[in-house]
Amino acid sequence: MVKTEICGKGSSQGSEEERLSQLPDHLICVILSHLSTKDAVRTSILSTRWRNLWQLVPVLDFDSRELRSFSEFVSFAGSFFYLHKDSYIQKLRVCIYDLAGNYYLTSWIDLVTRHRIQHIDISVFTCSGFGVIPLSLYTCDTLVHLKLSRVTMVNVEFVSLPCLKILDLDFVNFTNETTLDKIISCSPVLEELTIVKSSEDNVKIIQVRSQTLKRVEIHRRFDRHNGLVIDTPLLQFLSIKAHSIKSIEFINLGFTTKVDIDVNLLDPNDLSNRSMTRDFFTTISRVRSLVIRHGTIKDIFHYMELEPLQQFCYLSELSAVCSISNLEMLLNLLKSCPKLESLSLKLVDYEKNKKEEVMSSTVPPPCLVSSLKFVKLESQLLGCGTELKVARYFLENSTILEKLTLKIDYMYKDEANVNHIRQTLHAVPRCSSTCEVVIHSLLY
């Protein structure tokens, strides 16, 4: 939503207004559609040319905070729904900060679902409960993009969303597990799914089964009773952020899928959980592009203490967030990536009470000798020098490295410190004679 102010006209503002006024009505309506409805109405005072253009905008955007009282908000929004009761509405966005709005929300959604609505974005922020989505939304045959935040989706017998391509659920409460299953399975052209949720609902096992989904993001607080099933053969991108999850099952996950994993398994060393852990690592070992974080790296290390880690034979691109106390764990992972070509490594200090590890493996991982071409290091540390040690390790041990990039996010007092880092790295003996070293830093 864009905030705008109508000010007095100066000469430059007048000329800009004249240029805008020369545009055809449909282009002006496109511009107005990027404003809130309240701000779009305010443009009517610009000139007689603009007086009624806001009425042609097929986008309704309401926020109850923009009015002095909730009753004033209901009156303001209601007048627009009455104005559009017989016309096309392309997009509806409603943000409500009063639970009393649930009654009006139902009637508004019922109205727009009868008028070829394509985009719906509903958010209800109250401390006493969630707004309830009416039944009409579950059978809207023109809806393309649905975004819901802090609402309740009830159990329904019939769901039909034939045009829905993007589904974004942010802290949505489901009355039972079948509701989410029905919505996904009854959206035959669904391509993108995002679920952000706490563990406090009635969905214990999230099942994502779709023949059309290309992008899935699950960011959820799981507990020891929760699980996840992914069955999406056409998936191109998968992001899972979950803590203390009981089980994860992948079905038909293609090796071309880019996977972003931030998962803490309950206990990879638990015998009852080891089979699931093995299957989990076996599946992600087949992908070509992988993003992992500190917790997952630790799980991999603990798993490797019990049995050998599967080889990531297809992996060519790896991005990792790694604590400086777990650098040896990272090296052990790299030993299972024989064809890795690109490594992006972000150094953090999550475990401040633990000693920093030095990458001192006498035998470098095979990928450093045969395949690794690009290394990007990013540091948010306060000048402890770890990034220099890591950079030195890759420069001294990577046979065919083409480029090493060091990005430093912390503040340096002067250019001299950056020059010192640059000179230090350029003085490091390089195993690859063609390797280029690039340093990016922010000076304040």
UniProtKB/Swiss-Prot annotation:
List residue spans for each LRR repeat: 103-123, 124-150, 151-171, 172-197, 199-224, 226-252, 273-299, 300-321, 322-347, 369-396, 398-423
PROSITE patterns the UniProt entry points to: FBOX (PS50181)
Q: Which PANTHER family match?
A: F-BOX/RNI SUPERFAMILY PROTEIN-RELATED (PTHR31900), FBD DOMAIN-CONTAINING PROTEIN (PTHR31900:SF25)
Species: Arabidopsis thaliana (Mouse-ear cress)
For this protein, the record's InterPro entries field holds:
F-box-like_dom_sf (IPR036047), F-box_AtFBL13-like (IPR053781), F-box_dom (IPR001810), FBD (IPR006566), FBL13/AtMIF1-like (IPR050232), LRR_dom_sf (IPR032675), LRR_FXL15/At3g58940/PEG3-like (IPR055411)
Listed transmembrane segments? none
Tell me the protein's name.
Answer: F-box/FBD/LRR-repeat protein At5g53840
The protein's matches in CDD domains, at most eight in alphabetical order, are given as: F-box_AtFBL13-like (cd22160)
Transit peptide found in the keyword field: no
Residue limits of the F-box domain? Answer: 17-63
Q: Where is the FBD domain?
A: 356-408
What keywords is this UniProt entry annotated with? Leucine-rich repeat, Repeat
